[in-house]
């Protein structure tokens, strides 16, 4: 069963992550939402008191422990089929970064391990991914965590992130290198 959240807290997501080009499943998005939530708690200095969630520094980043139920949306996942697929898929995805001096290609998460008796998952996040979650140099989007977690579609989640708190009309091209089709990996899937 999914984790119950009493307060619909606001989270801040890096605009770099909001506008990035990627194709995630809703469960992969929920893993990312939980990472953003944990990263913000760490920088705010909030201690995790429930003994179910942990952020432990390592030589290369963070070791994250959390309940598998944190990524579910009112479903039962008795044999961890949904969770295994989501963590496996996200561990196969990378963030590619390049500027004038550096090129890097880093997995988003590594070594996911589900402990079936306790219902928890442990995985690792490299420092440059952790920093990306907290990179507000290009701005940020603020949205309600519970609302974002409730959507069934990854596209609905992405639109919610883009539109949340928007007071002026948002003009985003449909076509082109920064268009919605390319950002959402929908090239060739819809008729013009």
List each model region and its residues:
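Charged, alpha-helix-forming regions
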Residues: 1-192
